[in-house]
Amino acid sequence: GGISVPGPMGPSGPRGLPGPPGPGPQGFQGPPGEPGEPGSSGPMGPRGPPGPPGKNGDDGEAGKPGRPGERGPPGPQGARGLPGTAGLPGMKGHRGFSGLDGAKGDAGPAGPKGEPGSPGENGAPGQMGPRGPGERGRPGASGPAGARGNDGATGAAGPPGPTGPAGPPGFPGAVGAKGEAGPQGARGSEGPQGVRGEPGPPGPAGAAGPAGNPGADGQPGAKGANGAPGIAGAPGFPGARGPSGPQGPSGPPGPKGNSGEPGAPGGEPGPTGIQGPPGPAGEEGKRGARGEPGPTGLPGPPGERGGPGSRGFPGADGVAGPKGSPGEAGRPGEAGLPGAKGLTGSPGSPGPDGKTGPPGPAGQDGRPGPPGPPGARGQAGVMGFPGPKGAAGEPGKAGERGVPGPPGAVGPAGKDGEAGAQGPPGPAGPAGERGEQGPAGPGFQGLPGPAGPPGEAGKPGEQGVPGDLGAPGPSGARGERGFPGERGVQGPPGPAGPRGSSQGAPGLQGMPGERGAAGLPGPKGDRGDAGPKGADGAPGKDGVRGLTGPIGPPGPAGAPGDKGESGPSGPAGPTGARGAPGDRGEPGPPGPAGFAGPPGADGQPGAKGEPGDAGAKGDAGPPGPAGPTGAPGPIGNLGAPGPKGARGSAGPPGATGFPGAAGRVGPPGPSGNAGPPGPPGPVGKEGGKGPRGETGPAGEVGPPGPPGPSGEKGSPGADGPAGAPGTPGPQGISGQRGVVGLPGQRGERGFPGLPGPSGEPGKQGPSGSSGERGPPGPMGPPGLAGPPGESGREGPGAEGSPGRDGSPGPKGDRGEGPPGAPGAPGAPGPVGPAGKSGDRGETGPGPAGPAGPAGARGPAGPQGPRGDKGETGEQGDRGIKGHRGFSGLQGPAGPPGSPGEQGPSGASGPAGPRGPPGSAGSPGKDGLNGLPGPIGPPGPRGRTGDAGPVGPPGPPGPPGPPGPP
């Protein structure tokens, strides 16, 4: 056969249907196969088209307001506002200038001057024997001058004398020591921080207008831009009032205001006590003959202290006329009318009583000579230089607190201005209305009470309005889809970001990213309303003292202060001019009886005689025997007064007379109105003690010359020696009482002297921190005149030399007549040194010795101890609450946050739970402080501290002249 060649395989047939299960049992399941290797991932399919944008989710519910976060730490304190300037205290009404002494009136015509004999040494009093019929003995030789009697007791101050005419203002006084500040008051609760204002330029110090009487308060000036004082703390307790601070430069002094009434001391001398009966006559002593009128006595005690005048050069004495013929001495005529009353000087400390010497036998009067023609009146001399400065006195003790004065006028409140750029602070506005002060109760000011309990805490302020949204940030680039991250911890919600505008198509939902950092804090909201005022905190540290603002207008005059006790006596002033004759005193005891004579007819006034030339000193004659006592004669009629005689040459000074009796105590005078303040004056230098002059020998009286015509006034001649005593003439008949002469012309006023420096201040309480004094503001209009203050104590300024008295009128002739009643005692002289208290002699009127020379001015007494510190004044009223500052301006919006990068779109997760409220953002910058509130009114003035103890008495002044016979 043939070879079979296989053909190609045919196609396989269709798969057969499964056969029926075999009859055999089912096999066991085989072990699991090993896992196959994972297949490699297929290629990524193409990215599907983006799905439609999802709908914006509904706005979530507004979160409930979170609990207010804990109060953050206080923000940095803004610059401390300058301390509110306390309402300037009303300028103290400066004590009016002491009214300069009015021009001293010319002394009234002196009553006929008794002829002073040289006092003999005091002998033991003898019994007055009956006057025998023997002839009159010749005058004995002048005995040596008696020892100076101890100073008499100082008369108590009489009622004030009439107010002298206002003098020109004094020169500036010395700058007083700067008063120490009172204790620091507790700091009030701090108000909103004020914008610190630049200190305004000080206003130029205007020239002070004329002071005059204080006018009504002027209209308050327009309120300047408020500076930046913080709210003033509650006023501290006023410290003890310090001495006046240094006076700022003041304009030229205005014209003098009304002169205040002179305070005590001063006043007319009290009536002379009734002279006791004459003591028994002593044994015949060294009593000289009664000579012609001796030299003029020393000037009377100084008048009320005026402004020190310049010491005048003495005017030239007139040329002596020819010697008059000797006349017989008559009995002293009645005292002339009193001249213009001099202002009373300060009383000195009483000296101890001196021994009273026994009276010598009285000489008999001679017949009066014929009167000469009146002489021409001399011209006033040039003013002298001021005297040395006296020692500083101690401060007087403070009196009780006075009733507070009426409240000042209410100033208009300023309008609330908008906060502008920082400008210079304007002048302080007028003080607000002050409540009336209740009357002061009796007793002294108590100590300040303990601090009160703290007040309630203020409620928290309301939440401020949120600031504006920031500008939207730019949209970020779309990121790739990331793998889902782990769910982060829920962080605090950040602040809402700005709402974007015109965002592009949303990216795919990214997986939640990690919580971003907290956003920047939003701007600070407006300040909430202030809570209730908390309790006053403890006093804070004293801030830096701000510049003192310009001085505001003076406030109304304060209530009068309590009258202080009299300070220590100042140094003795220079010898004042001779006082006018005093009022007629009580009638003295009857003198020794004279021979009875017929009543004389009224004599015609004789022509005035010129003063005689001084005779040569004669030898002293032996003492004559005592003359017999004559029977009392009738009192003659009053004779007509003769014309004034020419001024005689001055004789040597006589010895010091006995002290005058103490004057009666007068009621205190009314307080004077406070005058405008005077500028400070220069401090004078204290002069040294001058040598004490020796007492010259008593001259003997020469016979009077015949009357001559009055000559022209020439240059002053030297004092001639006293003439020898002439032989006594026979007893003249008692003439009629002369008519009282008219008072002389008033002398010219001296120039005002410089005021003395102010005394040292008393101790002051602890001082608060004080800043530098700012320049003084212009002087405001004068305030209304307050009630008159009590007279303060007199400062211890140096007393200037008195202005030169006008030339005295020509001396009248001695008129005949019965002995005049004793005149009132002269005003007490300055305090002399305390002499040793001698044994008290028997009382009896001693003979008036001739006036001695003025003693040298004693040195200034030692300064008294410093006064105790005054008590703390009562707490001032709390100032009204300052105006709340305006809400600060809203701070600027914070910068927009940097945009975050777009995260990959993730599947939208479920809404998470609402997060807790976020922590409070850090506080924004403080807004600008509002304008400060007005300054509260000043508290009431503290009471003046008690005065220190009285210093030791000053040095002795020159002795006063002897009283009238």
From Swiss-Prot:
Glycans are attached at K92, K881. It comes from the Eukaryota. The keyword Glycoprotein applies. Contains mostly 4-hydroxyproline. Proline residues at the third position of the tripeptide repeating unit (G-X-Y) are hydroxylated in some or all of the chains. Contains 3-hydroxyproline at a few sites. This modification occurs on the first proline residue in the sequence motif Gly-Pro-Hyp, where Hyp is 4-hydroxyproline. The modification 4-hydroxyproline is found at residues 18, 21, 23, 32, 35, 38, 53, 68, 74, 83, 89, 116, 119, 125, 139, 160, 169, 172, 199, 202, 214, 220, 229, 235, 238, 253, 262, 265, 269, 278, 293, 299, 308, 314, 326, 332, 338, 347, 350, 359, 368, 374, 386, 395, 404, 407, 425, 442, 448, 454, 460, 466, 472, 484, 493, 506, 512, 521, 539, 554, 560, 581, 587, 590, 599, 605, 623, 632, 641, 653, 659, 668, 677, 680, 716, 725, 743, 752, 755, 761, 776, 782, 788, 796, 802, 819, 822, 825, 896, 899, 917, 932, 938, 953, 956, 959, 962, 965. One of its GO terms (cellular component) is extracellular space. This is Collagen alpha-1(I) chain. It comes from Acratocnus sp. (strain SLP-2019).
